[in-house]
Amino acid sequence: MQMDAKTGDISGGCPFHGDGGTRSLLGRTNRDWWPDQLQLEILKEGGRNPDPMGEDFDYVEAFNAIDYTALKQDLTDLMTDSQEWWPADYGHYGPFFIRMAWHAAGTYRTGDGRGGSSSGQQRFAPLNSWPDNGNLDKARRLLWPIKQKYGKHISWADLFILTGNVAIESMGGPVFGFGGGRKDVYEPEMVYWGTEEQWVDTGAETRIHPDEGRALENPLAAIQMGLIYVNPEGPGGDPHDPEGMARDMRETFARMAMNDEETVALTAGGHAFGKCHGAKPADTFGTAPEGENLHLMGMGWLTDEEEIRNGHVTTSGIEGPWTPNPTQWGNDYFRLLFKYEYELTQSPAGAYQWTPVDPEEADMAPDARDPSKKVPTIMTTADMALKRDPDYRKISERFRDDQAALDDAFARAWFKLCHRDMGPKVRYQGPEVPSEDLIWQDPVPSGTAPSDSDVSSFKSAVLDSGLTVSELVKAAWASASTYRNSDHRGGANGARVRLAPQKDWAANDPEELGKVLSKLDELRGNLSMADAIVLAGSAAIEKAARDAGHSVSVDVTTGRGDATDEHTDAESFEPLEPFADGFRNYLKTKASVKTEEMLIDKAHLLGLSIPEMTALVGGMRALGAVSRHADHGDRIGVLTDRPGQLTNDFFVNLLDMGTKWEVVDESGDEEFVGKDRKSGDEKWRATRTDLVFGSNSQLRAQAEVFAESGNEQLFLDTFVKAWTKVMDADRFDVTYAKYN
């Protein structure tokens, strides 16, 4: 199949067609884009792991054993080791590798923490074939000899980012530091990238809602399908709207946690290097890697070899460098941006770009292949936005006049870009980890593990405090369940559930939560609040099991610290607020994704298996640990006559054929009533996240196991294991202690 360089049209169309209403959790998938793609899923049946390194491989240990100095020297040497099959522009691969690293990290989004550089996803579809990643397959091939040499000691994920750092350093640019430890995965991650049927051009903006001020669909960050950030030609490809371009830039960069200053610094810093490629008509652009012929060995976007050697290459379609010194760090970008007036032109590929009016020869750039030739510099509509938007312009003028300020801002913003999805600083490895703690790393002061006697006394006091099992379990869940396995943010460590904004989230039942936290603070003595919240939840679960005639022990790894407002960027935590939390039967409002699919999404972010998710839902319902419903208080989904006891009643009653379920008409298919099949009397109220465990064949199979006589202990053990997993999900201070 052929794909157009500008529009992203794939010949033959796409077999997946949404109806414009409710979408699936994952939207358009690789199979939709490439129906003939080799399917390996059958080999993963039975839980077979595709990781060839095996479960016992410790990547962090391997990384820390690398000859780091030698690796960086090899990367430095590569920068100017131009290869005939893909020659370096200006004799230097630095700009090419910066783009590779930028695009590896730049898929990160704050909405769900997915994307980013932490697992080397740029190697796989769809990212390896996005139009915005055009020709980066060659960058990865250039790196292969170094990856092969250092083997298990450097992951692709780490190599992408470190190579970007070395590229900047090799051209005189500023670098703040580097933290390694990104472990490769060996298959595409299941991420929602959008529902559009084509990439980049008109028709690829269904995520934008013009009637709502061009609001961008959550959790997406890129403005169009197949882009990392924005369309460089302008909003929807319209170059006549630089102000609208600024709006798009502000939105998309904010969704990857960047403010205006960081946005300007990153844009200017990235565009200080290299050039855009649009030397040929767009219709000569070859097929993307994932759809190419077998004998091309995973390479795509190919053209005539002689034209490649001559630099006649098309990627974005825009053609030309931004500065007269494309392989040297400096301030030429801002100098030229403000020195000249720019006129709208088109590249040989037909892309819109901006060219300086009457440029001086000294401000011309060398040709990428023949330094004796001079070519004009260019700006994109995105660059023009920095000049047109008042706030961006103010920052840009300051950077133009203060090189040191630009150096520092770019170095810090680049570091943030490349490390935002790595989680707490304790996960960073290697000799170049900066000592400075940064607020976006969500720092937590070190805690002290309490004595066994202090723990025992506290748990007894909690159970005598008058707080209910439900209240204690809900508080612990509210604290820990913010964790995201995607970017390793959130979790119980730090007890940020007592700080803004988390303390006021509707899902947390703020009034009840405040009462619980106040009492725990009164009782905790020398314990941190973070430990106290989790210990109180464990005490409640143990009591609930005893009250049901069982005995369980809920292990708690103590030693958590307490964060303060000073340690917390409250605004950055707002995307962690749950829109839906099926474990608590919470739904803010009906969404375009089915409620039960949002439960699956939440379980995925928590790193849970299907049995763990199932047991947690059933256990939380039995404990009465659900968010308060407008009409039914804390009873919706609580399918038991003995709430507060840890039983398998939820599954038993859900699967009872003596109950007939009906939709509550005014609920919009979100709420259901369970009636006695004979008498017609109401027995239960439930939601989609309850009934899915009876309606979905795979989830029903799980529920049946937990409902069976003789499997009560299996249910309890699975619930406790899953609960502990969630409570300890963010304890990198413990799991990484051996490396630091």
Swiss-Prot record:
UniProt cross-link Tryptophyl-tyrosyl-methioninium (Trp-Tyr) (with M-256), position: 102-229
PTM description: Formation of the three residue Trp-Tyr-Met cross-link is important for the catalase, but not the peroxidase activity of the enzyme.
Example GO biological process: cellular response to hydrogen peroxide
MF-aspect GO terms: catalase activity; heme binding; metal ion binding
Enzyme class, UniProt record, top EC level: oxidoreductase
Entry keyword annotation includes Oxidoreductase: yes
Chemical reaction(s) catalysed: H2O2 + AH2 = A + 2 H2O; 2 H2O2 = O2 + 2 H2O
Positions bound to heme b: 271
Pfam families attached to this UniProt entry: peroxidase
UniProt keyword terms in alphabetical order: Heme, Hydrogen peroxide, Iron, Metal-binding, Oxidoreductase, Peroxidase
Cross-link Tryptophyl-tyrosyl-methioninium (Tyr-Met) (with W-102) placement: 229-256
Enzyme Commission numbers on file: 1.11.1.21
Cofactor(s) this protein requires: heme b
Residue(s) at site: Transition state stabilizer: 99
Gene3D superfamilies: 1.10.520.10, Peroxidase, domain 2
Annotated GO CC locations: cytosol
Cofactor remark from the record: Binds 1 heme b (iron(II)-protoporphyrin IX) group per dimer.
Role, per record: Bifunctional enzyme with both catalase and broad-spectrum peroxidase activity.
Assembly information from the UniProt record: Homodimer or homotetramer.
Official protein name in the record: Catalase-peroxidase
Organism: Erythrobacter litoralis (strain HTCC2594)
Lineage start: Bacteria, Pseudomonadati, Pseudomonadota, Alphaproteobacteria, Sphingomonadales
